[in-house]
Regions:
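Acidic, serine/threonine-rich, charge-biased low-complexity segments
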Residues: 1-10, 121-127, 206-214
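C-terminal regulatory/linker segments that are acidic, Ser/Thr- and Pro-rich
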Residues: 180-214
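Catalytic and GAP-homology cores of small GTPase regulators
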Residues: 1-109, 115, 119, 178
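Extended serine/threonine-enriched, polar tracts that run as long, contiguous segments within proteins
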Residues: 88-156
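Intrinsically disordered, low-complexity regions enriched in proline, serine, glycine
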Residues: 33-34, 114-118, 156-158, 172-176, ...
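Eukaryote-specific, cytoplasm-facing alpha-helical/coiled-coil scaffolding segments in long proteins
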Residues: 44-62, 125-128, 139-147, 166-177, ...
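Short alpha-helical "patches" and their helix-cap loops
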Residues: 37-45, 156-169
Length: 214
């Protein structure tokens, strides 16, 4: 077998292991993450309600508020990516949710390319074309925050814990690990939102945001 075939086989085995271990413990895990009962449930619920209020405030802002450049703003307001995010609640396994997260990111790039990409001038087939402005990490994060704020996930906080803390570590590599970090950063921005600040943490040039305590 080739290296790619070994990698696929290994990944399939890890997914099977995750399914066998996570599903029987799912109810307990959700309780521990705040979706069930327990002595700290009231505080967790209050924190999540506060986060959702802040998320609604961010969702009410236009793309320009998050400093999304005009060359990156979406005429469709990233509706395809938001719809993908909404579908995450249809999946149980952390790896399945993480896979949706990666698809959301790809959809953002695809939407940007489609809406700001090849733009024929005139009617001939040899017309010059306009190339989309490249999207760096510092450009991607504000868009991702916009999409996260406007999606309808039942619990962003629980989803964050499931993806970042309960998924098998060996699966948290490459794109999956990178966009899980983006999810953390987006949640951190929303959790620290005060309704006045108009920056998405670009002062350091890294595109980082406040760290979430959730």
């Amino acid at each position: 077998p080739t290296d790619d075939e070994w990698a696929l086989t290994r990944r399939a085995a890890l997914y099977k292991l995750e399914r066998r271990t996570f599903i029987p413990l799912q109810e307990i895990i959700y309780q521990l993450l705040g979706a069930g009962t327990g002595p700290g449930r009231g505080q967790r619920q209050e924190e999540e309600e506060r986060f959702e209020r802040l998320r609604a405030l961010v969702a009410a802002q236009p793309q320009s508020f998050l400093e999304i450049q005009p060359s990156h703003q979406s005429p469709s307001e990233w509706k395809s990516a938001i719809a993908l995010f909404d579908s995450m609640d249809n999946y149980s396994l952390p790896s399945e949710k993480a896979a949706v997260l990666v698809e959301v990111a790809r959809c953002i790039y695809e939407t940007h390319g489609r809406e700001h990409g090849a733009d024929a001038v005139g009617g001939s087939g040899a017309s010059p074309q306009k190339q989309p402005t490249p999207m760096a990490a510092a450009d991607f994060l504000p868009i991702f925050i916009f999409v996260l704020a406007r999606c309808h996930l039942r619990s962003v906080i629980v989803t964050r814990h499931l993806v970042s803390e309960t998924m098998i570590t060996a699966l948290m590599i490459g794109e999956t690990g990178y966009y899980a970090t983006m999810l953390e950063a987006a949640i951190g921005y929303i959790a620290a939102f005060d309704g006045a600040a108009k920056a998405v943490g670009r002062s350091s040039g890294s595109g980082s945001t406040a760290t979430s305590s959730f």
